[in-house]
Swiss-Prot record:
It comes from Trichormus variabilis (strain ATCC 29413 / PCC 7937) (Anabaena variabilis). Its EC number is 6.3.2.6. GO terms for molecular function: ATP binding; phosphoribosylaminoimidazolesuccinocarboxamide synthase activity. Keywords: ATP-binding, Ligase, Nucleotide-binding, Purine biosynthesis. The gene is purC. GO terms for biological process: 'de novo' IMP biosynthetic process; cobalamin biosynthetic process. This is Phosphoribosylaminoimidazole-succinocarboxamide synthase. Pathway: Purine metabolism; IMP biosynthesis via de novo pathway; 5-amino-1-(5-phospho-D-ribosyl)imidazole-4-carboxamide from 5-amino-1-(5-phospho-D-ribosyl)imidazole-4-carboxylate: step 1/2.
Length: 245
């Protein structure tokens, strides 16, 4: 496979076209952003770590029957993926109250929700990625009613799988963000990445609200030891996969 030209550069990855029209190369960066890119920095080794975690989780999801854009990982910080048209919706699944849910509703941080909450956000930096109702989403024609139903079903399936996987890693899955895309056959595939950048992860055996954090909140909230936390997550993922296999 040969790389052609840069197709798109986002906050965490660069996408390149290849000599295969339906295959892209995703290059994971060490760049870190928070608060809609108002805070910027770098996390040493983040690209390599997130690529490895995402690769492992995509393969586990594929084995469980969830279709993803993942093909393989030709180098530590690169992933070959199927070309998809990204649906401009960020799907957030919440299991425990934290972040904006606590801030906007007054639900106490750490409250376990009676059932998973699925939220949709418009993927638009200029507008601040606003929360959308289902009716607004349909009004804006970001997806069809059938696609919204399928995405919701997939998100809950993925949540069930990941909650159990992270639990086996000694990690609590608080909430996380997913993105989906359409392939050339108009099939919905899980895209983007699954990593400490996109998941809120707490060390299950740690009670301290700061020390338990194992995700990008360490960067957002200046908690320190960001690289160590990401590396620990990767090591636990690799161990869990090895045991499972």
């Amino acid at each position: 496979m040969s790389v052609h030209s840069k197709l798109y550069e986002g906050k965490a990855k660069i996408l390149y076209t290849t000599d295969e029209p339906e295959v892209l190369l995703a290059d994971f960066k060490d760049d870190a952003t928070a608060f809609n890119a108002q805070k910027r920095g770098s996390i040493l080794g983040k690209g390599r770590i997130n690529c490895s975690i995402s690769s492992q989780l995509f393969q586990q999801l594929e084995a469980s029957g969830i279709k993803t854009h993942f093909i393989d990982s030709p180098s530590p910080n690169q992933m070959r993926v199927k070309a998809v048209k990204i649906i401009p919706i960020e799907v957030v699944i919440r299991n425990i109250a934290a972040g904006s849910l606590s801030q906007q509703t007054g639900i106490e941080l750490g409250t376990v929700l009676k059932q998973p909450l699925v939220e949709f956000y418009y993927k638009n930096d200029q507008l601040g990625d606003p929360l959308l109702t289902r009716d607004r989403l349909l009004l804006m024609e970001l997806a069809t009613a059938e696609q919204v139903e399928e995405i919701t079903h997939l998100a809950l399936q993925i949540n069930d799988f990941l909650k159990n996987f992270w639990q086996n890693c000694g990690i609590t899955l608080v909430d996380f963000k997913l993105e989906f895309g359409l392939d050339s056959q108009q099939q919905i595939l899980l895209a983007d990445e699954i990593s400490p950048d996109t998941c809120r992860l707490w060390n299950t055996t740690e009670a301290d609200p700061n020390r338990r954090v194992m995700d990008k909140d360490r960067f957002r909230r200046d908690l320190g030891n960001v690289e160590d936390a990401y590396q620990e997550v990767l090591q636990r993922v690799l161990t869990a996969v090895e045991i499972k296999n």
